[in-house]
Amino acid sequence: MRNKKIICLLAAGLGALLLTGCGGENQKTYEQANADLEQGNYDYALNEYQTCISAGYKLSQSYRGSGIVKLRTGDYQGAIDDLTSALNDEKTGKSDQKDILEYRAAAELKAELYDQAMADCQTLAEDYSLNANDYYLTGCVALAMDSYDEASSNFSEAYGSDSTYEMAIQIYEAYLGQDMEADGTRYLEAALKTEAKTADDYCERGKVYYYMDDYENARTELTTAADKGSTEATLILGMVYMAQGDTSNARSFYQQYIDADGDDPAKGYNGLALCDISDGDYDSALQNISQGLGDATSDEMRDLLFNEIVVYEKKLDLSTALSKAQEYGQTFKDDDAAAKELTFLQSRVGNQAAAGDASEADTSNESTAEESADTGTDESSEESY
C-alpha cells in the first residue's frame, strides 16, 4: 500500500511537472511573439502566435497579436477574422475589447469594408471614451466614405486632443491620399506655430517642411535638430537633398545616419540605394540593398525589396525583376504600386518570350518604377494602432 502511494505521488508530481513545463514553453513562445511583433519580425511573430493559439494559450491575446501581424502585412481579412475571435473570447476584458475594436476597424478600413469599419467606430464612440487616435481613425473612415464634414470634425477632435507634429502629418497624409492636399496642409501650418524646444521638435518641424516641399526651411530645422543630437534628422536631411536631386549631399547624410545608428542602419542603406538608382549605378544599389536587408525589420524590408525590383528592371533583367515582384507580392499583399509593377513585368516578359529575342524588347513603354522607388516615408493609417 505504501509503495502504491509513493507511485501515485510520483505520477502526480510528474504530471504537474509536465503541465508546468508545457505552460512555461507556451509562455516563452508568447513573450517571444510579442517581442518579434514589436521589432517588426512579422513572420516569426505570426508563427509564434499561431503556436499559442493551437495550444489554447492566452487565446484572446494570441488572436489579437496574430490579427495585428496580419493587419501590418496586408492580410486584412485574416486580421479581421483573428481580431473577431479575440473579441468573442469570454476572457477578453472591456479595455482589451476597445483596443481590439480599434485594430479591427483599421483592418476593415484597409479592406475597404467601410460600413463595417464605421460600425466599429460608432461602437467605440458609444461604449468608450475616445482618444486622439480613435478620432483620427474615424476621420479616415469617414473620408473614405466621402463624408467630408464628418471627417473634418473627427480630424479636428484628433488634433485638438493631440496637437503634435506627428498627428498633423498623419492628417495631412490622409487628405493627400484623397487628393485633398489643401485640407491637410492647414494642419501642417498649425503645427508649425508650435515653438520648438527639443531636438525631436526641430526634427518634426523639418519633417513638416519636407512634406510641404519647403526644402530650405526643412534643412534649417533639420540641421538644428542634428546639431542637438537627432539621428533621425540626418536621415531626413538625406531625403531633402534627394528630393532636390542632390545625390552627393544625400549620400553624405545617409552615410552619417548609418554610422550614427549602428543598431538600425537599414533606412540609411535604402537611401544610398535610391541615390545609386538615380545615378544609374545599379550594381552598387544592389549591394546597398543587400546590406540593408541584413538588419531590416519587416517594414524596412518592404522598402528595400521593392527597390530591388526597380533595380533589376532598370538593369533590363526583367525575368529576375518579375521573380522578385512575385515573391514581394506574396509577402506584401496590400502594395498597389507593386501590383501594378507585377502586371507590367508579366506583360513585358510575356512579350519578350513571344518575340523570341529578349534583347530586342521595346523599351518605349518603360514603367514608372524609378519614380515609384520606395523612400520608406509612407506612414499608413493603421500604424497608430
Label each residue range with its predicted role.
Residues 18-21:
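C-terminal motif of bacterial Sec signal peptides marking the signal peptidase cleavage site
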Residues 27-28, 61, 95-99, 133, ...:
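Start-of-helix register in tetratricopeptide repeats
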Residues 57, 91, 95, 128-130, ...:
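Short coil turns that delineate tetratricopeptide repeat
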Residues 65, 99-103, 136-140, 170-173, ...:
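Canonical tetratricopeptide repeat
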